[in-house]
């Protein structure tokens, strides 16, 4: 059975309904109106170069009856070349592209034909579609001075109300404008098999990153936007995070490929921050930092706005070579609730699930309702990491308050980890440990369930630190480590190649082992 995830005026993203992780069980061919248009083996696939407001009949030998869909209608479609864009990779096309965006009528499409469009940051508006066709590249300018600085906070000159415009790692601070930027906009689609290239190596954005005067630009930044869809494109080489929706609602990323060199700093693929309803489906990532990092700000933003990252779905994604496949935090002071990760493959990431929090994130820093199921991990150093002692950011990261193993008072600075379920998973060639879950003595992790999981260890495993905290020793082929957990349920879990005890526990309120 096939389900439509997203249909624009010229593209469609569809998903096979099964319980397999990322890949289907066999190759398949897709026909549109009787003509072969796609072949592949992934659970999610896309069709492009469709006509607006047109009915299509999709057929495949693996479905019993044809699937019929209609593309959306649109008011008009305009080429950026009509506004003077050259697309030779040398000419600065910023003015031409921005003018085209400004002039585009509502419910219309701006088309980028094959070519390389060198540009400074672009500002989008509501009710438009950008189509970046195969062979088209939006290339960020290598001139840093072309990226305007956006203030972190502005105040209404009449009411004094605070408005956040710029943000960096969970704080409202001045930042360079993203290459593709939208503010308080709605109903925006970016589709196509083209590329958006941040051009960070040429601009020198990855050099001396700790001493930049302003937050480095994202590839795409959506601030307080609604109904945003990004479908099909290849995003690469951003100066920092690649896709960053901030305080936005109903955001979806479908069938993207996002890449950056393994050693590139802060090049997370998708980092939704304090967003409500986010879908990340059918995407492939290979980056220098976390593949997906779900955030909700540091304590100032979390305490003031109390806006959790809520109702996020991650499904049928392939994540490679990141620090964490799916990371929560460390900027999560507003909380993370109702997260489902399903049918994904994690390959050679440092960690599978990676929770990063610490004392000081605040009482609103609640992570709860997290489910991982039907996951396959290959060569992941530590598949499950829940760390309430994270020490790799903030000026006080090395303070005794952060690292002390003493039971401190629960106060307005204390985070909370609630219920977590991991089931139907295969984790092959682990190295450091199967699990490393370490709660606070004053605020243990509420409940962890691990069921129907196979962990195997690489015979060539190298010692590694499973989590980033003060005084963290290296592990190698360790089993499941749990400390400070109120209720732990272990059901039908198999470990192969572990050195020592399979289950290492301390300060567990209730242990249920089946």
Task: Give the ranges of each region predicted by the language model.
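Extracellular/periplasmic carbohydrate-active domains that bind, remodel
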Residues: 1-514
